[in-house]
């Protein structure tokens, strides 16, 4: 198999990267009706598998789970999750032959094996679904030509997909039809019904492509969503302790700080996050963000280039073949960092204190979001996709750090995201430690920024620069579709 994207000519590549259309709510008037009465079999019962299945069943669809015989015989976690929630569970041989839609929600590295196992069992003219297009785009998997191949990709962890649905809402979602596999022209109807069944149509759906979803998803998770949070956590904690701060306080400021400051992103973008600061602190955060961009800009664009070329996926798949040697080594090293082992702090940190004492962290968020967004757009990815894969998902990932620090983040995200995170953070961490940390001033981290005289013209120009960045302009439009977003921060 060959990387599918690399088999396309330039015109086709640009067309696929640029597929992005925000769908009207009226297009989902039929909701999930197209799939009602059809048999849907989900392969895999992890976070996405279980929670999408719960939503789809509650939307009136016929859902069952196909698991490997050993998972059933040994009553593994996937079997327990499915049966405890009242789902029918069976082997591939028992369930796949009668399925109208088979949804593959296993980890990326298992996709080729799953395809090889289920494809011979699937009935003629059925459909096959993904929630991430890596197997199609990067691995180059070729699906039987009579089978319709679609994607529904919620832009949230599986737990959030369920919680938002229970509130009568949903999470923003990308949908796509693989252009090589739509023999009956029903792909979009299937994808729309699936997205509606998960509740995604209530938060906004982008009609995208497998290519655009994969390339933007990989870029976001490697850089701002995971890599920047990991690198920032490590260097900020080390700096606080080196400055004599209580290690327990430093740990809590970082652990819950990302979540608290990015909650402002969710409600009002970078503009609101920066508005939580005093004028003196805002100007300093802006200055620091520009310095961080100068230091890390090349790394963001390198990751984007390696994702577009297929170099990243080839490197990671080589590690798969080597038993995940690098992944496991990097995971172990992360567990040994000082931040991961910081003592618990029982004191209270107010919401505003996270902003006042975290100016450097805010600068890292601003710089990281803008760099990731700009790199994606410069590579042909549309602004809507770039927004969802940078700013929108950041509060959700920050929330995982608030639970159990970097360990929880790396458990919740996919192995693909975790591998890319380490590639980025392993390079970004020493750069930040060498080029940014030594030049910090009093009030950049761990204590409030001292008040200084603020020039009206300077403040006006900085505010204009913040508010007029393209990620802010498209973000304001897209957040209009998500007016019922819940508050997720739990910091205390």
Curated annotation (Swiss-Prot):
Its EC number is 1.1.1.86. It catalyses: (2R)-2,3-dihydroxy-3-methylbutanoate + NADP(+) = (2S)-2-acetolactate + NADPH + H(+); (2R,3R)-2,3-dihydroxy-3-methylpentanoate + NADP(+) = (S)-2-ethyl-2-hydroxy-3-oxobutanoate + NADPH + H(+). It is an enzyme of class 1 (oxidoreductase). One of its GO terms (biological process) is L-valine biosynthetic process. Its cofactor is Mg(2+). Binds 2 magnesium ions per subunit. NADP(+) binds at residues 45-48, 68, 76, 78, 108-110, 158. The keyword NADP applies. InterPro entries: 6-PGluconate_DH-like_C_sf, 6PGD_dom2, KARI, KARI_C, KARI_N, NAD(P)-bd_dom_sf. Residues 14-208 form the KARI N-terminal Rossmann domain. The active site is at 132. Mg(2+) 2 binds at residues 217, 389, 393. Keywords: Amino-acid biosynthesis, Branched-chain amino acid biosynthesis, Magnesium, Metal-binding, NADP, Oxidoreductase, Repeat. PANTHER family: KETOL-ACID REDUCTOISOMERASE, MITOCHONDRIAL. This is Ketol-acid reductoisomerase (NADP(+)). It comes from Haemophilus influenzae (strain ATCC 51907 / DSM 11121 / KW20 / Rd). The gene is ilvC.
């Amino acid at each position: 198999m060959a990387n599918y994207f690399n088999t396309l000519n330039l015109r086709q590549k640009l067309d696929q990267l640029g597929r992005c259309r925000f769908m009207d709510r009226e297009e989902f008037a039929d909701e999930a009706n197209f799939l009602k009465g059809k048999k849907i079999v989900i392969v895999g019962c992890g976070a996405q598998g279980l929670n999408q299945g719960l939503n789809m069943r509650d939307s009136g669809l016929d859902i069952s789970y196909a698991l490997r015989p050993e998972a059933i015989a040994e009553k593994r976690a996937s079997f327990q999750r499915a049966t405890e929630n009242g789902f029918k569970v069976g082997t591939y041989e028992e369930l796949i032959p009668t399925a109208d839609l088979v949804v593959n929600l296993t980890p990326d590295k298992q996709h080729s094996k799953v395809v090889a196992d289920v494809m011979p069992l699937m009935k003629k003219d059925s459909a096959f679904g993904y929630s991430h297009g890596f197997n199609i785009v990067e691995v180059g998997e070729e699906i039987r030509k009579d089978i319709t191949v679609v994607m529904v990709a919620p832009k949230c962890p599986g737990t959030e997909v369920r919680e938002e649905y229970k509130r009568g809402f949903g999470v923003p979602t990308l949908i796509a039809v693989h252009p090589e596999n739509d023999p009956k022209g029903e792909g979009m109807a299937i994808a729309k019904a699936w997205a509606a069944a998960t509740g995604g149509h209530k938060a906004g759906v982008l009609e995208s492509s497998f290519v655009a979803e994969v390339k933007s998803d990989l870029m976001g998770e490697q850089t701002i969503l995971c890599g920047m949070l990991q690198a920032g956590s490590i260097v900020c904690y080390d700096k606080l302790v080196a400055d004599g701060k209580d290690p327990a306080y430093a740990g809590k400021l970082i652990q819950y700080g990302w979540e608290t400051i990015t909650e402002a992103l969710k409600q009002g973008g970078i503009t609101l996050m920066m508005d939580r600061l005093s004028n003196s602190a805002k100007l300093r955060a802006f200055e620091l963000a520009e310095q961080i961009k100068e230091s890390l800009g090349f790394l963001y664009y390198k990751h984007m280039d390696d994702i577009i070329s297929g170099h990243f996926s080839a490197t990671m798949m080589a590690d798969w073949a080597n038993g995940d040697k690098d992944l496991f080594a990097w995971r172990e090293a992360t567990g040994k960092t000082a931040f991961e082992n910081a003592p618990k702090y029982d004191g209270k940190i107010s919401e505003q204190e996270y902003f006042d004492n975290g100016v450097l962290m805010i600068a890292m968020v601003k710089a990281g979001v803008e760099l990731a967004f700009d790199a994606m757009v410069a590579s042909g990815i549309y602004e809507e996709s770039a927004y969802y894969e940078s700013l929108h998902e950041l509060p959700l990932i920050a929330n995982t750090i608030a639970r159990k620090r970097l360990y929880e983040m790396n458990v919740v995200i996919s192995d693909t995201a975790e591998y890319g995170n380490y590639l980025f953070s392993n390079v970004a961490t020493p750069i930040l430690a060498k080029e940014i940390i030594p030049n910090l001033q009093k009030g950049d981290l761990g204590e409030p920024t001292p008040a200084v005289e603020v020039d009206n013209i300077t403040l006006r120009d900085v505010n204009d620069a913040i508010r007029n960045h393209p990620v802010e302009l498209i973000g304001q439009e897209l957040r209009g579709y998500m007016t019922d977003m819940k508050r997720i921060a739990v910091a205390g």
